[in-house]
Amino acid sequence: MAIQTQLPCDGDGVCMRCQVNPPSEETLTCGTCVTPWHVSCLLPESLASSTGDWECPDCSGVVVPSAAPGTGISGPESSGSVLVTAIRAIQADVTLTEAEKAKKRQRLMSGGGDDGVDDEEKKKLEIFCSICIQLPERPVTTPCGHNFCLKCFEKWAVGQGKLTCMICRSKIPRHVAKNPRINLALVSAIRLANVTKCSGEATAAKVHHIIRNQDRPDKAFTTERAVKTGKANAASGKFFVTIPRDHFGPIPAANDVTRNQGVLVGESWEDRQECRQWGVHFPHVAGIAGQAAVGAQSVALSGGYDDDEDHGEWFLYTGSGGRDLSGNKRVNKIQSSDQAFKNMNEALRLSCKMGYPVRVVRSWKEKRSAYAPAEGVRYDGVYRIEKCWSNVGVQGLHKMCRYLFVRCDNEPAPWTSDEHGDRPRPLPDVPELENATDLFVRKESPSWGFDEAEGRWKWMKSPPVSRMALDTEERKKNKRAKKGNNAMKARLLKEFSCQICRKVLSLPVTTPCAHNFCKACLEAKFAGITQLRDRSNGVRKLRAKKNIMTCPCCTTDLSEFLQNPQVNREMMEIIENFKKSEEEAEVAESSNISEEEGEEESEPPTKKIKMDKNSVGGTSLSA
């Protein structure tokens, strides 16, 4: 028994069986493939399933016997049934939007199959010339919003004289065909796509000289890349403690994986490089270790400023900056400008406000101090900054940032014979405070204080949570990734920004002069301006004059284009993909930060510290 032939309507709405264009009330639309069918040409067996969403004979797989010769209509066990199953699976996928379902159905019906083309392949196919079906070379965008290669467009519009779009058959203005303009925003998008593609291919990668901590020697060493001999270009040796760079306070035994005793007061090292390996003071040149938004963790007394005064249990420390280090100068003793409370100086002031403990190391280079070691670098315990101010330095020309450090450690100082550590003591009298400016004295209770019940110094508030990864290479990797995300965002804002609102394009339209605007911004720019201007004054009747609507970026007349501006859909998809990737990256970054911070967190103040110039504070080192 043969199968009866049943044919749908074509793209123009004409029935392919009776060659009649039926009205809409005489057609049925399939709920699966969305194809119209002429009711009069359908067999009664096909209309029997009209309850709910009607399915056409091709999708339902209904076999109608007939005496006619066999045709190619599929039965329930043929490939047509497989096609219907695939279409139904697409329709049942709740993760897809209607537009994505339509694309998948179209690709399936055209023979491409629902092979699950990955997102990267989709992105590659988003921009293509409608003539050569390749990435546009010097892309040109027509007023109807379709993109072509410059050569293809010239061959189509100028060489063949066709002034209609190949895709939508919209009319192309003669001035656009005669003088096409390259869309620079699409050029940047294509270049960025090519760079991303090349970065994923196997190429000669840049060599990164990475040595893991466990593979480093015990002492600082020089590599083959060192320019100078000695320790001028030396690399750091192995780190013996497991603390992050922004760790506050003493280094406990739990972080000493080698000796299980922590770093004790009075320990000495040969130089700053070895001191760095034990985490007491990480910078091997700078005297202050800290961050302006977090606080200062440690300082080094090494004779850098003549203004420093060392009295053992307390000392006056000078901030950094104000010296000309241009010309690759590492040290300059002459003060050339005022110091300001920013960067490292701001970190010290924040530690003063919050009452954080600051580790102090003294170097043999401090020749004017009786408490400095004879050789090497020595750890002298933790101090607390009680006051900070500005005052003219000993050179008599420029202001210096000054800090009062007072010792508050549970271990005795190296220069004393005491068996116990420090106790709260009165603050010393500092004569230079009489002429000080920008004086700040902590009023609130400090984070590091003395517990009378336990008789020792400890954290009275939760210590600041570390914001740095322990692994140096992991920290560098995160920094590079964040820098790359910022660069991507900056490029997105620059290349795909509206020329009116300066924001990322929303519903982008490309003018005949190849400028890109938000559709709403461009329409609002010329809102209320009619196409023609009536010049009749009641006495004389003149012809209506055309209003010139000049492009906001050039002198091109956009009056004809503004009659029906078309959105550049391909560019809009590119922008949406960029935004989606940015949102995913931000969510991933925020989740990583939340995992590192944990449940308890003590945030430093985010607002700028307000200085109380009239307050001189208490006269004792409070607990």
UniProtKB/Swiss-Prot annotation:
What is the species of this protein?
Arabidopsis thaliana (Mouse-ear cress)
Where is composition skewed (Acidic residues) in this entry?
594-603
Q: Where is the composition biased (Basic and acidic residues)?
A: 604-613
**What EC number is given for this enzyme?**
2.3.2.27
Please state what class of enzyme this protein is: transferase
- Occurrences of domain YDG (ranges): 258-407
* GO biological process terms, semicolon-separated: negative regulation of gene expression via chromosomal CpG island methylation; protein ubiquitination
Q: Which Pfam families match?
A: SAD_SRA, zf-C3HC4_3, zf-RING_UBOX
Give the boundaries of each PHD-type zinc finger. Answer: 12-62
GO MF annotation terms: histone binding; methyl-CpG binding; methyl-CpNpG binding; methyl-CpNpN binding; ubiquitin-protein transferase activity; zinc ion binding
Q: What is this protein called?
A: E3 ubiquitin-protein ligase ORTHRUS 5
- Entry domain remark: The RING fingers are required for ubiquitin ligase activity.
- GO annotations of cellular component type: nucleus
Phenotype on deletion?
Answer: Decreased DNA methylation primarily at CpG sites in genic regions, as well as repeated sequences in heterochromatic regions. Released transcriptional silencing at heterochromatin regions. Ectopic CpHpH methylation in the 5S rRNA genes against a background of CpG hypomethylation.
Q: What does this protein do?
A: E3 ubiquitin-protein ligase. Participates in CpG methylation-dependent transcriptional regulation and epigenetic transcriptional silencing. Mediates ubiquitination with the E2 ubiquitin-conjugating enzyme UBC11.
Record localization: Nucleus
Q: In which tissues is it expressed?
A: Expressed in inflorescences.
What chemistry does it catalyse, as a reaction equation? S-ubiquitinyl-[E2 ubiquitin-conjugating enzyme]-L-cysteine + [acceptor protein]-L-lysine = [E2 ubiquitin-conjugating enzyme]-L-cysteine + N(6)-ubiquitinyl-[acceptor protein]-L-lysine
Spans through the membrane: none
List UniProt keywords, sorted A-Z: Chromatin regulator, DNA-binding, Metal-binding, Nucleus, Repeat, Transferase, Ubl conjugation pathway, Zinc, Zinc-finger
